[in-house]
Curated annotation (Swiss-Prot):
Family: Belongs to the CI repressor protein family.
The organism of origin for this protein: Escherichia coli
GO terms of molecular function: DNA binding
Protein name in UniProt: Protein ORFi in retron Ec67
InterPro entries: Lambda_DNA-bd_dom_sf, Phage_CI_C, Phage_CI_N
GO biological process, one term: protein complex oligomerization
Protein origin, superkingdom: Bacteria
Keyword Lyase: no
Pfam entry (one): Phage_CI_C
Keywords of this entry: Transposable element
Keyword Glycosyltransferase among record annotations: no
Length: 198
């Protein structure tokens, strides 16, 4: 049975792991040599070499590096986990709406890692419909075949739109489909990404 008081407790031996940690410091700063690291830390080459050869753990340098570069303290210390701290990853907060009985209900916001979001979003929102989450864009140049957030007589829903000749469209749901004039509906947003929860 574990006697650890903390779920993420890490045991650090001050006399072990120094070589690997110093190599991670070089990588985190973007240097190519340990000499460049020594110059940046304003320590002599012999001081750094001594810690490296004795495998002495450089806790003070690791803290400095984490503060200066935003590199994950866990990665610098152990080499495990993500190199970049979650605190420095670019994020974007999007307004969230929930579809309930055909109504769009404001429901806070979601924060996403920016790299997760589709490119070129101009006016993004998140729509939650049951177990499905949609990342949508309210700004679009034209309506093409695909899935859209639409408003029909005050009822909002996610539907597949297929353009037909003479200003007509086909609207498809999982249960049925029908045709109507494009002018009969309001297209609110384009569905750019779909996330399904189990």
């Amino acid at each position: 049975m574990s006697t650890s008081k903390y779920p993420s407790e890490i045991k650090i031996n001050p006399n072990k792991g120094g070589k690997a940690a110093i190599e991670r410091l070089v990588e985190a700063y973007g240097f190519t040599t340990r000499q460049a690291l020594a110059d940046h830390l304003e320590v002599s080459k012999s001081t750094l070499a001594n810690r490296y050869l004795r495998d002495t753990f450089p806790a003070d340098w690791i803290i400095q590096c984490a503060l200066e570069t935003g590199t994950s303290l866990k990665w610098l210390t152990t080499g495990q986990g993500l190199k970049q701290s979650s605190l420095t990853v670019a994020t974007e907060e999007l307004p969230k709406f929930r579809l309930t009985a055909g109504k769009m209900i404001e429901d806070g916001s979601y924060v996403f890692d920016s790299s997760f979001l589709p490119a070129n979003l101009s006016s993004p929102i998140v729509i939650q419909d049951g177990l499905v989450t949609y990342i949508c864009d309210q700004k679009f140049s034209e309506v093409l075949d695909g899935h859209w957030l639409i408003n029909i007589d005050g009822t909002y829903s996610i539907r597949k739109i297929t353009k037909l000749p003479k200003g007509m469209i086909k609207i498809t749901t999982t249960e049925n489909s029908f045709e109507c004039a494009f002018s009969d509906i309001e297209v609110v947003a384009c569905i750019r990404s779909t996330i399904v929860s189990n």
